[in-house]
A protein has these predicted regions:
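Short functional hotspots at interaction and active-site rims
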Residues: 1-153
């Protein structure tokens, strides 16, 4: 599944695909380009560090679509990408019991959850209290955050 989380509204855009290659990722980007209003001049896309996101075909697509700007957070910082938080909610609410007859049933359940979510969509709210908790944990475990890296939770 490919998914994008609109940090302003909490709306989720999603697409299921049998494989995760550059071609499918570009198809998802095309979907985003169609569904996100043209009045949104810049679409910031936070991506994990999969090779697929940096491939030649994707880079060629990106060059032709200048309103899309890719951002790759540091390794091991997936929590900085808010769609990962949404995936966690999806996992707990719909995928805990994997009782799917087939891939089609799984895709239907995923799309149904996106529809339900978008009816009550809301942005995630990070707070400075979360930063304090992260820093306290780092102090307790002796594992300081990497230098020059943002700290959030």
């Amino acid at each position: 599944m490919f998914a994008a989380f609109d940090t302003r509204t909490g709306k989720v855009y999603g697409m299921t695909a049998a494989r995760k290659r550059q071609a499918e990722f570009i198809a998802f980007l095309e979907q985003l380009d169609r569904e996100i209003p043209a009045t949104v001049q810049t679409v910031h896309v936070v991506l994990d560090n999969l090779r697929m996101h940096k491939g030649k075909q994707v880079q060629a697509w990106l060059a032709k679509h200048p309103r899309f700007v890719f951002h790759h957070p540091p390794v091991h910082c997936s929590w900085m990408n808010q769609v990962e938080q949404w995936f966690s909610i999806l996992q707990r609410k719909r995928l805990r019991i994997a009782d799917f007859a087939d891939k089609t049933a799984l895709a239907e359940r995923l799309h149904a959850f996106i529809t339900e979510w978008n009816q009550v969509a809301h942005p995630f709210n990070w707070s400075t209290k979360s930063v304090a908790k992260v820093m306290a944990k780092c102090k307790r475990t002796g594992d300081p955050p990497e230098e020059n890296q943002p700290v959030a939770a």
